[in-house]
Amino acid sequence: MAAALRFDNIGKVFPGVRALDGISFDVQAGQVHGLMGENGAGKSTLLKILGGEYQLDSGSVLVDGRAMRFPSAAASIAAGVAVIHQELQYVPDLTVAENLLLGRLPSALGWVRKRDAQRFVRERLAAMGVDLDAQAKLRRLSIAQRQMVEICKALLRNARVIALDEPTSSLSHRETEVLFKLVDDLRRDGRALIYISHRMDEIYRLCDACTIFRDGRQVASHASLANVPRETLVRQMVGREISDIYHYAPRALGDVRLSARALEGDALRAGASFDVRAGEIVGFFGLVGAGRSELMRVIYGAQRRTGGALMLDGEPLDIRSTRDAIRRGIVLCPEDRKEEGIVAHASVAENINISCRRHGLRAGLFLDRKREAETADRFIKLLKIKTPNRRQKIRFLSGGNQQKAILARWLAEPDLKVVILDEPTRGIDVGAKHEIYGVIYELAKRGCAIVMVSSELPEVLGVSDRIVVMREGRIAGELARGEANEEAVLNLALPQGATAHAA
């Protein structure tokens, strides 16, 4: 019997880069096949070929034994294939129901029957165990909720082949469990699934088989993971041993650099108060909706401050805009890289230099292109940013390399004082994480106060000098590195009455 999906010697070349070279593996009906590899290894490129976004240069894709060409996303969908990319695709001003039924809304005489659409979507969401308001507009939903909409869209199309690219990167523990149940149900229903994740726990929990990519090549395939140690997968992914991904080392701390006192914003239920010292890394942990990102955006001037006070190096700090924050040496690497972090149509060099340009104007008026080129080349080499050259459009880089470019932007700032990192390694592979942690430590050694928001508890525990836990829009507690462990942090993060054991 033919495999539900087969990749046969797939090749893809971009200018200056061989993105895929000789990729061959099968996915059976009723199987979850994991794909692992560093950012830029070619995993997402393969899914874009499967989804009709890119055209392959060599090889073939077979669905149920038939060779297929997907000149468009519509052709892929018509063949029973659904690809859910890490960078979500939705219409922000349409409702959940309208996004889910886009292109096939029920109508009569040319008029869309919205009530019928909403009822149908509510029934299907309930059957899938997903708690979403069918009438809510997508722009009002969290990133986690938008991701669930994309997953539900594939299920509503009854796709027989489903590819998921980092589907849990923004999901809460509860939402992740809902997704896992859906994946298990789809496997039992005989669907073929491709599952890309950098999270080892997910790969071992869900996947029947696994293929490893490195630098566009297929370096290993495992028909079963039952007897494959995690260390083997890491070594195959990165081509080297990584014994301690966090490589934490204590450092000398300076005086208090950033102080928040009774800070309030539209999404913060109680005044938030905390300090961060020069050279200190303070991790902020909390469940989805705890208010961490909202607090960071208030500090950065991206959201309105309704009360409380900020101080920088002991002096009152009045920030009314993000421009004010940057001028005072406070920067933010946002959670949503695509929408808020990068300038997608600009080059890697332009993205790195976009903030520090004001320091390097010739005669106070003209851009110093030579200086910008040297700055970009220096950080591309220092941070090992995978790009053909500094002129490459940043949108063509992997998520991990885009994040490195954003960090390079702030490393190039001469007067940096506070760095806020919101989910700095979301959707990034283990090798790139290792390198990004090194950048964070380097910023701390320079005397920057580092505030790191992360939903990955091992990361918070592994990198932070101190941990602040948020719950339901307020600070629930604080733990020193020496007293912090998973149970202690979760007991602060969970709603009152729940315990870490219950989670």
Swiss-Prot record:
Intracellular or extracellular location(s): Cell inner membrane
Q: Does the keyword Nucleotide-binding apply?
A: yes
State one molecular function term (GO). ATP binding
Q: From the UniProt record, list the reaction(s) this protein catalyses.
A: L-arabinose(out) + ATP + H2O = L-arabinose(in) + ADP + phosphate + H(+)
- Write down the SUPFAM superfamilies for this protein, in alphabetical order: P-loop containing nucleoside triphosphate hydrolases
Report membrane topology.
Peripheral membrane protein
The entry's function note states:
Part of the ABC transporter complex AraFGH involved in arabinose import. Responsible for energy coupling to the transport system.
Q: Recorded E.C. number(s)?
A: 7.5.2.12
Provide the species name: Burkholderia mallei (strain ATCC 23344)
Query: One Gene Ontology cellular component annotation?
Result: plasma membrane
> What family is this?
Belongs to the ABC transporter superfamily. Arabinose importer (TC 3.A.1.2.2) family.
The record's section on InterPro entries has:
AAA+_ATPase, ABC_carbohydrate_import_ATPase, ABC_transporter-like_ATP-bd, ABC_transporter-like_CS, P-loop_NTPase
PANTHER family xref list: ARABINOSE IMPORT ATP-BINDING PROTEIN ARAG (PTHR43790:SF6), CARBOHYDRATE TRANSPORT ATP-BINDING PROTEIN MG119-RELATED (PTHR43790)
The residues that hold ATP are: G37, E38, N39, G40, A41, G42, K43, S44
Record-linked Pfam families: ABC_tran (PF00005)
Question: Start and end of every ABC transporter domain?
Answer: 5-240, 253-497
NCBIfam families per the record? PRK11288.1
Report what the protein is called.
Arabinose import ATP-binding protein AraG
Which key words tag this protein in UniProt?
ATP-binding, Cell inner membrane, Cell membrane, Membrane, Nucleotide-binding, Repeat, Sugar transport, Translocase, Transport
